């Protein structure tokens, strides 16, 4: 998800998105550990998405 799209969301929606992304990352890590994950690039993408969401959340909290 792009940062511009994330900035349009409110803090509650960002929190929900963060929870979904963390859950997806957990599932991907489990699949990777059991050698069932074919698209290993998704791990990196989801990690970066989580970082983007957290960054936008922090920006919004500081803005007020």
From Swiss-Prot:
Cleavable signal peptide? none
Keyword Transcription listed: no
UniProt keywords (A-Z) are: Ribonucleoprotein, Ribosomal protein
Q: Which GO terms describe its cellular component?
A: cytosolic large ribosomal subunit
What is one Gene Ontology biological process annotated in the Swiss-Prot or TrEMBL record? translation
**InterPro entries documented for this protein:** Ribosomal_protein_uL29 (IPR050063), Ribosomal_uL29 (IPR001854), Ribosomal_uL29_CS (IPR018254), Ribosomal_uL29_sf (IPR036049)
Molecular function terms in GO for this entry?
structural constituent of ribosome
Source domain of life is Bacteria
Q: SUPFAM superfamilies, from UniProt?
A: Ribosomal protein L29 (L29p)
Pfam families per record: Ribosomal_L29 (PF00831)
Family designation: Belongs to the universal ribosomal protein uL29 family.
Q: What is this protein called?
A: Large ribosomal subunit protein uL29
- Species this chain originates from: Solidesulfovibrio magneticus (strain ATCC 700980 / DSM 13731 / RS-1) (Desulfovibrio magneticus)
